[in-house]
C-alpha cells in the first residue's frame, strides 16, 4: 500500500501521504487512498463500468488535485466508485496532460462498507514533491 493516513494533521478532515517511483504511480496511489477513505475494502470495487478521464493543467500538483476532484465528482453525481487502472501524464507545450482509464461500479452499501463521505480535496497543506525515491504527495480531504 503506497499510502498512509496521517492522524495528527487534521481533526475534522482526513489527511494522507501517498508516494510512487514516478508520477503515474503516485497519482494512482493518491487516487486509491482517496477511495479508501470512502470504502473500507478497495478490492470490493469491481471493474464493471469504465470512464475515460482527460485533464489539463499548467501546474503538475493541480493536475493531481483535478484528478481527485474528478473521482469525487463521479461518486457524487453517478454514485460510482472508481479506481485508476491506466494513466499517462505528459508535458505538452505549456501544460501537463493526463489521460486515464478508471474502472469501478456503483456504490452498493451491502458490498462496499463505507467509512466517510469525502466532499472535496482541500488546498490546505496540499503538495506534490519530487524526492530521491520518486514522488510524494500530502493531501487533506474534506469529509
Q: How does the language model describe each region?
A:
Residues 1-143:
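N-terminal intrinsically disordered, cationic/polar leader segments
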Amino acid at each position: 500500500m503506497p499510502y498512509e493516513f496521517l492522524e495528527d494533521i487534521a481533526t475534522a478532515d482526513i489527511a494522507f501521504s501517498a508516494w510512487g517511483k514516478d508520477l503515474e504511480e503516485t497519482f494512482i496511489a493518491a487516487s486509491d487512498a482517496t477511495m479508501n477513505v470512502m470504502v473500507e475494502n478497495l478490492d470490493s470495487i469491481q471493474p464493471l463500468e469504465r470512464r475515460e478521464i482527460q485533464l489539463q493543467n499548467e501546474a503538475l500538483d493541480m493536475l493531481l488535485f483535478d484528478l481527485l476532484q474528478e473521482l469525487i465528482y463521479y461518486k457524487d453525481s453517478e454514485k460510482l466508485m472508481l479506481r485508476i487502472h491506466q494513466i499517462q501524464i505528459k508535458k505538452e507545450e505549456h501544460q501537463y496532460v493526463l489521460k486515464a482509464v478508471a474502472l469501478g461500479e456503483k456504490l452498493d452499501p451491502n458490498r462496499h462498507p463505507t467509512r466517510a463521505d469525502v466532499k472535496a480535496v482541500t488546498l490546505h497543506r496540499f503538495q506534490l514533491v519530487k524526492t530521491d525515491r520518486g514522488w510524494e504527495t500530502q493531501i487533506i480531504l474534506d469529509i
